[in-house]
């Protein structure tokens, strides 16, 4: 990476950022490669999240390519349900990503606190994700790692896709294992070529998890999880009570043949989504 950092935004003006431009606040989270802090741009007082990644960790885990790809992809995307990456800078030891601040934090925390979501909340988030993925797929971006930990909520309860570390910008089929075990599509488990349909599969997994509190193919071991995924060992518990329309959507997404999964467009037109999703994508009543 060059010593200079660029923010190509309105008017294509380039801003050279440094740590002196920010007032650093409380820590927001900690990851494998660094930490995230609440921060405020000193001049404008604009609140952001500052993701700090240690270069030593980048070297240790050999994630140069993955990080560069994440930065390039996320900087280029502009969608209300995708977290903005405003720019980046670095010093001798660290790389700093300047990110949109999502006041509500991780959807994962909300899900664990509440056990599961209501059908209205779940449908709203699946609709928001579908719109964001339709946009990504239109830009030849496959996310490949959508999970509650990678989904943030803003102050209104609007969903934001946050982590593009496993994303890939490609119009061709790919053949690498990535993403999180419980969310992997069968073609990825078998290390077969995969395309945009892996994201459609993940929408089915998430819809199930939103409504029941756990992913559908969860098992004691990785081997057993993979077996359940490949068998499409799908069952719907009696509690909590979930509508047949919701189960219908999930069943049309968790299909082994990628070409037979419900398309993003059809997801957004599904009766359960139309009936339950908030058109503005807001879940103001959710406890964040």
Curated annotation (Swiss-Prot):
GO MF annotation, one: histone H3S28 kinase activity
GO biological process, one term: phosphorylation
Principal location listed in the UniProt entry: cytoplasm
Gene3D superfamilies, A to Z: Phosphorylase Kinase, domain 1, Transferase(Phosphotransferase) domain 1
Record key words, sorted: ATP-binding, Centromere, Chromosome, Cytoplasm, Kinase, Nucleotide-binding, Nucleus, Phosphoprotein, Serine/threonine-protein kinase, Transferase
Residues bearing PTM Phosphoserine: 167
Enzyme active site: 145 (proton acceptor)
Post-translational modification: Phosphorylation at Thr-176 may regulate activity and degradation of AUR3 in a cell cycle dependent manner.
Residues annotated as signal peptide: none
Main function: Phosphorylates in vitro histone H3 at 'Ser-10' (H3S10ph) and 'Ser-28' (H3S28ph), but not at 'Thr-3' (H3T3ph) or 'Thr-11' (H3T11ph). Colocalizes with phosphorylated histone H3 during mitosis. Associates with cytoskeletal structures that are necessary for cytokinesis and with the microtubule spindle.
Name of the protein: Serine/threonine-protein kinase Aurora-3
Naturally occurring in which organism (per UniProt): Arabidopsis thaliana (Mouse-ear cress)
């Amino acid at each position: 990476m060059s010593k200079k950092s660029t923010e190509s935004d309105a008017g294509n003006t380039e801003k050279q950022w440094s740590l002196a431009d920010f007032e650093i606040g409380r820590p927001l989270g900690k990851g494998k490669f660094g930490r995230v802090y609440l921060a405020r741009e000193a001049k404008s007082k604009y609140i952001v999240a500052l993701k700090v990644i240690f270069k030593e960790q980048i070297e240790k885990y050999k994630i140069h390519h993955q990080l560069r790809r994440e930065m390039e992809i996320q900087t280029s995307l502009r969608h209300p349900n995708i977290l903005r990456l405003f720019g980046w800078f670095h010093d001798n030891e660290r790389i700093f990503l300047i990110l949109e601040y999502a006041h509500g934090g991780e959807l994962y925390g909300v899900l664990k606190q509440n056990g599961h979501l209501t059908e209205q909340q779940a449908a709203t988030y699946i609709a928001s994700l579908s719109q964001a993925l339709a946009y990504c797929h239109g830009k030849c971006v496959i996310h490949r790692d959508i999970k509650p930990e990678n989904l943030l909520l803003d102050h209104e309860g609007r969903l934001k896709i946050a982590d593009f570390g496993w994303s890939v910008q490609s119009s061709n089929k790919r053949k690498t294992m990535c993403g999180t075990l419980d969310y992997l599509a069968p073609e990825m488990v078998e290390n077969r070529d995969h395309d945009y349909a892996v994201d459609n599969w993940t929408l089915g997994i998430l819809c199930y998890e939103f409504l029941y509190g756990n992913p559908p193919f969860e098992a004691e071991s990785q081997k057993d999880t993979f077996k359940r995924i490949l068998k499409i060992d799908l069952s719907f518990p009696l509690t909590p009570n979930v509508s047949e329309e919701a189960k219908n959507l999930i069943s049309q997404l968790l299909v082994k043949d990628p070409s037979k999964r419900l398309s993003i467009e059809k997801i957004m037109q599904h009766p359960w989504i139309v009936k339950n999703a908030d058109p503005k994508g807001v879940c103001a009543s959710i406890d964040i």
